[in-house]
Regions:
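Catalytic Walker B motif of ABC-type/P-loop ATPase nucleotide-binding domains
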Residues: 157-160
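Helix-to-loop junction immediately C-terminal to a conserved catalytic motif
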Residues: 48
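Conserved signature/switch motifs of ABC ATPase nucleotide-binding domains
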Residues: 134, 152
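ABC ATPase "signature
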Residues: 217-218, 226
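Short helical segment in ABC ATPase nucleotide-binding domains corresponding to the A-loop/adjacent helical element
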Residues: 93-101, 111, 115
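Conserved ABC ATPase "signature" region
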Residues: 108-127, 180
């Protein structure tokens, strides 16, 4: 379980987050949605301590994030970004092996898991394992990025606008794939997007952000049927009902 308690982040005169309170249950697929600059990416960067709050605390399984060993915390967290961060001079298999090698897996364990996961995302290792990132399409590169994030069997998967640069077909395929893998591996997934359709499709619950504050946290159907504010209603194309 991940819990934000009265979390704030302030840069000089700008409040990036203000008094954020949010509880994310183990195994939940939580989507953070809102316009650019609303604080979505800041929230997930705080989980693996790329950013530190100026006020409040974030807890993982009842323990403050800042009390975890930083290296162990990051090795237990998968991260998938919009900018596909594969090392260009390493093959697909070598890119995927980086985290397992840090965890001292054997070569046999790495090879077996790499083959298994690449098959799940439709990239057979015999055909794709030896390729460089430059030899892959954008959608294929992001599939490799997902495998690399998942191979270490993280408890938490952070996904920051991972599909926004892809074509519509690749995006739809990867949305389905991500949800399937989330369920199969039982991870807690925190997914950032500005796309409300994507949020509705993927989320167990949605947290709607505006100007560094959470306006509503609810299941997709509740967001649509009972938006808490005019902002939430407008964002999702509806209206507030009394």
């Amino acid at each position: 379980m991940i819990e934000y308690k009265n979390v704030a982040l302030r840069y000089t005169e700008k409040d990036v987050l203000r008094d954020v309170n949010l509880r994310i249950e183990n195994g939940e697929f939580m989507v953070l949605v809102g316009p650019s600059g609303s604080g979505k990416t800041t929230m997930i960067k705080m989980i693996n301590r790329l950013l530190e709050p100026t006020d409040g605390n974030i807890y993982m399984d009842g323990k403050r994030i800042k009390d975890y060993n930083e290296r162990e915390l990051r090795l237990s967290t998968g991260y998938v970004l919009q900018a596909i961060a594969l090392f260009p001079n390493l093959t697909v298999a070598e890119n995927i092996a980086l985290i397992p090698e840090m965890k001292d897996w054997t070569k046999e364990e790495i090879a077996q898991k790499t083959e298994e996961l690449l098959a799940k995302v439709g990239l057979p290792v015999a055909e794709y394992g030896h390729r460089l990132p430059s030899e892959l399409s954008g959608g294929e590169q992001q599939r490799v990025g997902i495998v690399r994030a998942m191979i270490g069997q993280p408890k938490i998967l952070l996904m920051d606008e991972p599909f926004s640069a892809l074509d519509a077909i690749s995006r739809k395929q990867l949305q389905v794939l991500t949800k399937e893998l989330h369920k199969e591996f039982g991870m807690t997934t925190i997914f950032v997007t500005h796309d409300t359709d994507e949020a509705l499709k993927l989320a167990d619950r949605i947290a709607v952000l505006q100007d560094g504050e959470i306006r509503q946290v609810a299941e997709p159907e509740t967001i649509l049927q009972a938006p808490a504010t005019e902002f939430v209603a407008n964002l999702f194309g509806g209206s507030v009902h009394d």
